[in-house]
Amino acid sequence: MKVLNNLLYTGDHEWVRVEDNKAYIGISDCAQRMLSDIVFVELPEVDDEIAKGETFATIESVKAASDSYMPVSGTIVEINEELEDNPAALNEDPYGSWIVAIEMADKNELEELIKPEVYEKICEELDKEA
């Protein structure tokens, strides 16, 4: 299982990559492994305003459907349209296949996210339980 050191994470297994006031958001390797084969991703619309903690995407796999929750508040400025035709990209490259990009409303919310070294321990514990 892979955890990248240049990202921040949530307890719901989303990752955040910050570029100035823009944040790219996707699901972690840990999440895609739990979901298994991803077959569909329901994406939001560009210009949607989504508050921290609200659902921004639904990911369906052969095992289950899972909501993804916005780690920081903001406005959707980009969606990864590749996922409409190739949702399995989230399995193949979870850190290269972001879901949305947002213009953050409050960068201070980033302080509440999980650092990579802590998230790695969380995933290791989940692996032991599996």
Curated annotation (Swiss-Prot):
Q: Which UniProt keywords apply?
A: Lipoyl
Task: Describe the task this protein carries out.
Answer: The glycine cleavage system catalyzes the degradation of glycine. The H protein shuttles the methylamine group of glycine from the P protein to the T protein.
Q: Which Gene3D superfamilies match?
A: 2.40.50.100
Query: NCBIfam families from the entry?
Result: gcvH, PRK01202.1
| Classification via SUPFAM superfamilies | Single hybrid motif (SSF51230)
Q: Spell out the HAMAP family in the cross-references.
A: GcvH (MF_00272)
Q: How does it assemble?
A: The glycine cleavage system is composed of four proteins: P, T, L and H.
List the protein's name. Answer: Glycine cleavage system H protein
PROSITE patterns noted in UniProt:
BIOTINYL_LIPOYL (PS50968), LIPOYL (PS00189)
Provide the leader sequence positions. none
**Cofactor(s), names only, from the UniProt record:** (R)-lipoate
Q: Which Pfam families match?
A: GCV_H (PF01597)
Q: Record's family?
A: Belongs to the GcvH family.
Example GO biological process:
glycine decarboxylation via glycine cleavage system
